[in-house]
């Protein structure tokens, strides 16, 4: 299953994020999203990029807000939303990933008979968000320590919702932390829910639906409800980067 989810690009010396993502097999990404509801980008970020991003967590001027999960019943741990201007790496991921994912999102909407279509450029989609009062950037850094976890949830911040998002693991499993698996659940009509545990290496990203996805059944296309979270961290410290493409009110 892991091999089916993981899509590797061609390795080059010190590639940029744009060239690294261009080398990914996006047809395989789309096939994995259709089959499993998620797909792994590998490589996504270099170890140096991971370390640099994680190190910004304590730099207050880079963020617009901080959330302690236990105060809101979200789980244990904390996260911080970046302020504008976004870090160069985060902005590059958002603008480079969006066109690839918009094509998949439009295909899903067409299959489901939904009228909504997403523009080709992320700037045009953000303009729609901003006209609706969604002006706050949503990319975020998450930090988990021993015993921390993230309850199953959906990242919806207003009327305009881009249906796919990406999480990058910045820490090294085993070396930096144990436990803390990324978990997806799929609630299917008149059926038991299905869970998917997604194993990630440092620098890899997982693409997954924000709230639902179309699935082909014996009677045609139906919609399944999706949630995501993180299992309990057994030891160490775990950092992740969340790339959400719609802005918040």
Q: Across the structure, where does each feature detected by a protein language model lie?
A:
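Short strand-connecting beta-turns/loops that link adjacent beta-strands
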Residues: 46, 146, 235-236
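Non-heme Fe(II)/2-oxoglutarate
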Residues: 28-126
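A structural signal for short, well-ordered beta-strand segments
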Residues: 139-141, 166-168, 241-245
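A short glycine-rich, His/Asp/Glu-containing loop-to-beta-strand
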Residues: 134-146
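Short, conserved beta-strand element in jelly-roll/cupin
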Residues: 143-146, 159-176
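Histidine-centered catalytic micro-motifs
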Residues: 150-157
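Fe(II)/2-oxoglutarate
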Residues: 1-35
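Catalytic core of Fe(II)/2-oxoglutarate
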Residues: 162, 173, 177-249
């Amino acid at each position: 299953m892991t091999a089916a989810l993981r899509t590797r690009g061609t390795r080059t010396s010190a590639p940029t994020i744009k060239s690294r993502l261009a080398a990914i097999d996006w047809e395989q990404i789309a096939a994995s999203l259709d089959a499993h509801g998620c797909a792994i980008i590998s490589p996504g970020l270099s170890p140096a990029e991971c370390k640099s991003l994680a190190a910004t967590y304590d730099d207050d001027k880079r963020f617009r807000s901080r959330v302690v999960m236990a105060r809101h019943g979200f789980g244990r741990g904390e996260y911080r939303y970046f302020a504008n201007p976004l870090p160069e790496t985060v902005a590059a991921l958002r603008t480079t990933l969006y066109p690839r994912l918009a094509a998949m999102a439009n295909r899903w909407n067409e299959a489901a008979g939904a009228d909504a279509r997403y523009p080709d450029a992320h700037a045009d989609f953000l303009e729609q968000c901003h006209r609706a009062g969604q002006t706050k950037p949503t990319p975020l850094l998450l930090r988990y320590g021993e015993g921390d976890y993230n309850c199953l949830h959906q990242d919806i911040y207003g009327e305009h919702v881009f249906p796919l998002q990406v999480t990058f693991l910045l820490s090294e499993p085993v070396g930096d932390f144990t436990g803390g698996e990324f978990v997806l659940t799929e609630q299917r009509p008149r059926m038991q829910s299905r869970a998917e545990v997604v194993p990630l290496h440092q620098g890899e990203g997982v693409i997954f639906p924000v709230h639902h996805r179309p699935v082909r059944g014996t009677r045609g296309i139906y919609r399944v409800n999706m949630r995501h979270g993180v299992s309990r961290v057994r030891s160490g410290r775990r950092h992740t980067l969340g790339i959400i493409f719609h802005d918040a009110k």
